Every structure is written in structure tokens, then in C-alpha cells.
Amino acid sequence: MIQQESRLRVADNTGAKEILTIRVLGGSGRRYAGIGDVIVATVKDAIPGGNVKKGDVVKAVIVRTVKERRRQDGSYIRFDENAAVILKNDGDPRGTRIFGPVGRELREKKFMKIISLAPEVL
């Protein structure tokens, strides 16, 4: 469960290392976001020479959460960290590589480019 002011690790090679959630997209009163949800965030930590700089406002999709999520078959999925992938305006990932596993929920939300770049889909 990601909400305003939540900090997430960035799971791609855009140059950002950590982002801070500004807003959860999807309705005016929406408070929490899970795997596959889009957020607006600001870059808090970045490496020199990357595509994004500290202070940039970006859109990102959540790919891993510590809070478990119940699936349709009754199983639960959870990860060791909260992580996101930075997006372009058209919804494609800004980076060219994805690090670590991603949730299967991204397939249902039509983030096929992220699914194809990810090393593992759980």
C-alpha cells in the first residue's frame, strides 16, 4: 500500500535511485496504490549522468510492494521492498532495463513493455 509521501526504490536504469510519492492517480479521493497502479512522484536520489535528475516530477507504475496482495486464486504475493518503474507520457517505461521481479498484475493493467523487459514475473 503506497500513499502520499511513501518512498520507493526505482527498478529501472533511468538514473533515479529513489522517488517520493506526490499523488496516487485514479480518482480524487484515492488514498492507496498497489501493484500496477500509477503514481506521480518526485526524484529524491539520482546518479550523475542519468536520464532524470533530483527534483524531477515523474509518473511511475508500482511493480513491487511489501504489503501482501490477495490474488483471484486465493494466493498472496508480497515482496521485500517497495519499487516502481518510471514512465513516459505514453505509458511506456523510460528506461531500457528493469531490475528484479515484477508482479503479474502488470499484465492485467496492460503494461506489456515492462513485462517483456522484466527478468521475472511472479
UniProtKB/Swiss-Prot annotation:
Q: Which CDD domains match?
A: Ribosomal_uL14
Entry similarity comment:
Belongs to the universal ribosomal protein uL14 family.
What Pfam family does this protein match (any one)?
Ribosomal_L14
| Quaternary assembly | Part of the 50S ribosomal subunit. Forms a cluster with proteins L3 and L19. In the 70S ribosome, L14 and L19 interact and together make contacts with the 16S rRNA in bridges B5 and B8.
Question: Quick one: a GO biological-process term for this protein?
Answer: translation
Q: What keywords were assigned to this record? A: Ribonucleoprotein, Ribosomal protein, RNA-binding, rRNA-binding
What job does the chain carry out? Binds to 23S rRNA. Forms part of two intersubunit bridges in the 70S ribosome.
**HAMAP family reported in the protein's UniProt record:** Ribosomal_uL14
User: A GO molecular-function term, please?
Assistant: structural constituent of ribosome
Entry protein name = Large ribosomal subunit protein uL14
According to its record, what are the GO cellular component terms? Answer: cytosolic large ribosomal subunit
Kindly give the Gene3D superfamilies that the UniProt entry links to this protein: Ribosomal protein L14 (2.40.150.20)
